[in-house]
Structure formats: structure tokens, C-alpha cells
Curated annotation (Swiss-Prot):
This is Red chlorophyll catabolite reductase, chloroplastic. GO terms for molecular function: red chlorophyll catabolite reductase activity. Residues 1-39 form a transit peptide. Expressed in all tissues tested, including roots. The gene is RCCR. Residues 255-286 form a coiled coil. The absence of light completely suppresses cell death in acd2 mutants. The keyword Metal-binding does not apply. One of its GO terms (biological process) is defense response to other organism. Its EC number is 1.3.7.12.
Amino acid sequence: MAMIFCNTLYSSSSPSYLSPLTSKPSRFSKNLRPRAQFQSMEDHDDHLRRKFMEFPYVSPTRKQLMVDLMSTVENRLQSQLLPCNLPPDVRNFNNPNGSAEASLHIRSGDKSSPIDFVIGSWIHCKIPTGVSLNITSISGFLNSSTKAPNFVVELIQSSSKSLVLILDLPHRKDLVLNPDYLKEYYQDTALDSHRQSLLKLPEVNPYVSPSLFVRSAFSPTASMLKIDAEEEDKLEEILRDHVSPAAKEVLEVWLERCVKEEEEKIVVGEEERMELERRDKSFRRKSIEDDLDLQFPRMFGEEVSSRVVHAIKEAFGVL
């Protein structure tokens, strides 16, 4: 794409009838070529980001929620995030028969930032039973310079009238051994109020993951909920009036109380830093093994799955 752009630029700016100009190299050529290549790369990157932000297989209400959350993360943390550098065939990919498609957007944090990386994704897969599985998720992972929790929101849907919601600030310290951590991030922020409010709706019930690992990884205040509505419009109403405000408030807590570097959150001791790194990598590695390593080959085939999972492992620092 860059070469086509450059060739077009030079052919249109050098008329053939001006022989002195065509026989003499332009003094701007060395500058124009990298600029053209850079512009082309920027255009391609923008196209792939727009593709991710389409969230094309979900309802307008759900799409708006995901766009709002991702835009808030990128706008508020813009100075701390590096551009997404995933290969194009990892940022958007599908399986050979076209029954599954996914988009991936990962931005690493700057070296001076407490952010390790932010990841957003959507997955669409037609299941042999005739239904479609649609998963949309956004997560923020912090590095070992801070002990503050991470952020996750995920919506899993295989029916137009029901879905599973996971919304949490997953803890990175043992809550029994560190009661001050529990108080600071979960009690003082009233994080459990969102789960309690959602559970007051007759359509909402607790969701119990079949994975013991998943259940152990989330905080006691996690909103792990199953929403069953009689009508599609009712599900949209719950998403718009209840889930969306809760997700935005939890994200705000993460941005204000976890990402901002304050003295009490900075990890000082080398032993504590190493322990956080071990825990973070163990969590990421186990998540990939139990989820992507098992499910992606079924959805996308071995070749595509291998390429994408390798890129994710590299971004997660667990290669």
C-alpha cells in the first residue's frame, strides 16, 4: 500500500514533458518518500482502528457502550499509550469458511506509565446449532510499578434476549493478607453497589463461571451476572439504563483511583515488585491456556489461531 501511494505521488508531481526535471532527482525525494510511507501507515492504522470500533455484530446500544468505554480509555490515557503495533492479520482476522471473525486492539503503556497495556476485542462466531456467539471486551492491565487493580468489562451473548456480563477491578494482592487493599479499592469506592443495584432487576441473576480459576481471579465485588429478558427491547433497555452507567462508573474508579500514580500505590520494594510480576504473568498465562489455546483453534483453525495467540502472548509478556 505504501509503495502504491508513493508511486502515485511522484508520478503526479513530475510531468514527463519537463525533461530537465525528470532527469534530475528532486531535492525533496528523500523527505517525501518516508513521509508518504508514514502517511500510508497512519491511514492503514486508522482503518484498522475504525474496523475494531465498528463492533459490527452487536446491537446499537451495546456498540455504543463499547465505543464509549474504549474512547474514554484512549482519550484519558492518550499520553501514556503507545500506538497499536499488531500485524494487520492479527488486528482483524477470520476463519477460512467465514463463519468466525474477530478484531483485536492492543496498546502498550509508555515506559514511564503504570499501564502495562490496554486490550479491546470483539469476536463473532456462528455455532453449528445455528446461533451466533458474540463477545466484546475491554481490559486494562497495570504493571509492577503499582499494586492497584486491573479493569475488565466483557459481554458474552449467544441469544438476542440474554447475555452474560463480567465487570470488575480484579485484585492483584491477597485480600485476606492485605485488608487495607480491600478497603481502599473496594469498600471506600462502594464498588459492590453496582452489582447490588443490577441484581435488584428481576431479569438479572448471578452468573457462576464453570471455571474455578476464573472465579478465583475476580474480586468479591465483581458483577458476574446473567441477564435474561423476555424481549430484545427489554434487554436493550437494561443495557442502556443500568449496565452502561455501572460500567462507566467502574471505569471511572479505575482511571481515578488505580491508574493515577499516588505515593501509597507505588510499589517500593523489589520483593513486592517481583511478586506482582509473578502473579500477573501467571494470571495471563493461565488465561491464555484455559481460553484462547482451547477455543481459538476451534473457531479460527490452527494456522490463524497460532498466529494470533502468539501475538497476544508477546503483548502479554508470556512468550
